[in-house]
């Protein structure tokens, strides 16, 4: 099954972006896991684990009696995730190279499968979710979190914000990324043959010193090589060294706020 091209390939930039993203999204994911019932002793599979933010969160929930296995198609991401987990002292975490779409039950059943910002990049998220759910024991948990990227990112309609949004949206559209995967989760669970999921939606919002403009700037910085290759934007146009400051200047000038990704959480139990 084909997977759409990921929007960034420069590994150190991507590691930095995902770690910064975690500072914004991890509190939302933590609350989702608590609501869904992730608990001590569980064996958890993390889909598309990247540098391991979500895996480390899950490892905190399951404790030393539990186990978290993160899977990602990028060997470098797997290596970085393992390094970060080891440096943080996690002994209940392991990372493996693999594709979400090609998962098998060779290692036995899991108590839960989780994932954040993964299905939006898959050409067939229904099939991937069905296969992932097939790795979970009866009565186990399927819990995923996906964004809606199509809403307003700031209350300020400044030129830098308009240009940034245009670049990122065009890049996602070119890659055929599902920018509304979050609102599509209910239908995706249903099509995958799973019970109707519980749903929540939450976003990090802030003004002044708590404005999360750096998160949106990091997306553009990480995607810059691809945007240049596609002819969407140049390094000079993005000017990554000043982008966050320019975004914040427009927000502060109007006492506006910045809205992080609207993250939809969905969870259900496997029949």
Model-derived features with residue positions:
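C-terminal helical/coil "lid" or tail adjacent to the Rossmann-like core of SAM-dependent
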Residues: 4-7, 13-14, 25, 196-258
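A short glycine-rich, Lys/Arg-flanked "PGG" loop and its adjoining helix->strand segment in the class I
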Residues: 126-141
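Class I SAM-dependent methyltransferase SAM/SAH-binding core
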Residues: 45, 51-103
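Conserved alpha-helix/loop element of class I SAM-dependent methyltransferases that forms part
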Residues: 23-42, 57
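Core SAM-dependent methyltransferase catalytic element
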Residues: 192-195, 263-271
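Conserved catalytic/acceptor-binding region of the Class I
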Residues: 143-210
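A short SAM/SAH-binding and catalytic strip from SAM-dependent methyltransferases
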Residues: 111-125
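A short acidic, Gly/Pro-enriched loop at the edge of an enzyme's catalytic core
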Residues: 104-112
